[in-house]
């Protein structure tokens, strides 16, 4: 069964990789643009990235892309551009298998839990290999830049210090700089708890940001870089990238409650946050089984959330 790379639902007989409506949502056109590269020319791509300075920060390889519009009867084509590109592409990596499929699935799980995320999808190279693609929220349709600062910048730390800090410190920054501090505080803690449940130990200072979607308004960005690191790095004993209640390991619901309470959330809001995540477990199970992950990784993800004793969901 051929499935849509955006929504994972079955395609109609004449559709390839995307429903027209899904392509419109992520790319702005009814027909998805072509990604005219293959895994075999990634080395050439890497050299092009270095020459044109189109690389983006982060451990995982990232390329900055934009769309060259096609003619009336031809689809558009992605091309590597400078840092002003409206899309970010993450190809497969040699070290860890299936990271694009894993990141896209984890972003979908966040959406199922009603957590706002950046626009995202899977897309294929010309040779059929899957990549992860996301549309930048700090760029306008015309390529202009919106103000956006991550928590490394807001806490006046260097990029190499992105693992030096705590989630309580981020909560204080959200309260200080957000135009909707109480709402953004809840949204922030939802991202943190979700990351823990799904085994994401890489939500560091640069993976939370404030941006200005309209003049003189600063708000927490939708979630991005959501990835279950526990599935690809099972040897890592840390459960979070930053400290929570003074620790990164052996976390329990009480640790989250103490930190959220200290940041200013009341008990009812905290309990509702946990309930919101608990009630989507069945939907998560169903969606994982629809994903593009290999079956063995699907089973591992299901086990992380549901089967292992005790699961992180059971601990909340």
Kindly give the residue locations of the regions a language model identified.
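ATP-dependent phospho-/nucleotidyl transfer catalytic cores
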Residues: 126-127, 131-197, 242-246, 258, ...
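C-terminal hydrophobic structural anchor segments
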Residues: 231-276
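Conserved ATP-binding subdomain of kinase catalytic cores across diverse folds
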Residues: 42-162
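C-terminal reverse transcriptase regions that engage the nucleic-acid substrate
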Residues: 189, 193, 275, 282, ...
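Single conserved hydrophobic/aromatic residue that forms the stacking wall/gate
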Residues: 306-316
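A residue-level signal for conserved active-site and pocket-lining positions in enzyme catalytic cores
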Residues: 65, 110, 151, 202, ...
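Conserved kinase catalytic-core segment
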Residues: 94-112, 166-232
